[in-house]
A protein has these predicted regions:
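Short glycine-rich His-centered loop
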Residues: 35-60
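Active-site-proximal helix/loop segments of hydrolytic enzymes
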Residues: 2-20, 25-29, 61-273
Length: 273
């Protein structure tokens, strides 16, 4: 979740509680093990709902449910095309965190706990040997008329140009998919993650104004991802129209297909190093 204008918090880490769960799963397609590994990061999970919205018919839609559904659908598409896919979670939970990550009553993550969970996602992406990282989220804003798709990247990394290329592919492919199906979703474009002015977490200094899952490392404090990546805010759940759209399984599949198409195009057109 990011603020529609400045985004003053890390996506998916607005101090909400989380629950422990299963470890990350990496599943290979045995027929084509030579293809690159893709890491998908569905935001939130367990009792951490992320943001939430209400459809035109009064149905509640949670970010954690939508990110998981879209991520699993994306993984299915990619695996069918021969890619190996790893995910940061595979059900409505989060992999286990130490007790110290939680508040005294165990119902919330501390700021350090949030950072620990984000570091877990980064470490799992690195351990998977992935060639690309996509973090999936949905947005919210106080004005319910605000909507659209936006994708973030980090320009300061050594592979910043590839981050930009990937974010551009994600954004353009998603917007095109929505528009082709008659959904007039606003194109909020791509943005460098420093434009979010994201709040620092745990032991990170206040000057660290990057999204943790995309940004550079800090010696002794943060280990960064080792591959190009982007974070996409698919729609605004605070907009009843967009909450209604994404509540439909067919639209979840549409978004998953767009993500998969962008990922495959990124990997198959990647410049030689």
């Amino acid at each position: 979740v990011s603020d529609a204008n400045a985004g003053n918090a890390q996506p998916g880490v607005l101090g909400r509680p989380v629950a422990s769960g299963l470890a990350v799963q990496t599943i290979k397609n045995p027929q084509s093990s030579a293809r690159p590994v893709v890491f998908l990061d569905p935001g939130h999970g367990g009792v951490d709902e992320g943001t939430a919205g209400t459809t035109d018919t009064g149905e509640q839609v949670t970010e954690k449910a939508m990110t998981l559904s879209v991520a699993l659908r994306t993984a299915t598409i990619l695996r069918a095309d021969g890619y190996t896919v790893a995910l940061s979670r595979v059900d409505d939970s989060l992999p286990g965190l130490p007790a110290s990550a939680y508040t005294a009553d165990g119902t919330m993550l501390t700021a350090d706990g949030v950072l620990t969970d984000l570091q877990r996602r980064i470490d799992e992406a690195n351990a998977s040997g992935a060639s690309v990282f996509l973090s999936m989220h949905f947005n919210a804003y106080s004005d319910p008329s605000v909507g659209g798709t936006q994708t973030f990247y980090d320009s300061t990394r050594s592979f910043g140009a590839e981050n930009l290329r990937f974010a551009t592919l994600i954004q353009n492919t998603v917007i095109s998919a929505f528009h082709q199906q008659g959904y007039n979703v606003p194109d909020r474009g791509i943005a460098d993650d420093t434009q979010l002015q994201a709040e620092s977490l745990g032991t990170l200094p206040s000057s660290y104004d990057h999204l943790v899952v995309l940004g550079p490392g800090l010696p002794g404090r943060l280990r960064p991802t080792k591959m190009p990546g982007a974070l996409c805010e698919g729609l605004f759940l605070s907009d009843p129209q967009e909450a209604t759209i994404i509540s439909q399984p067919a639209v979840q599949q549409l978004l998953a297909q767009a993500y998969a198409d962008a990922i495959e195009k990124f990997l198959t057109t990647r410049p030689s190093q």
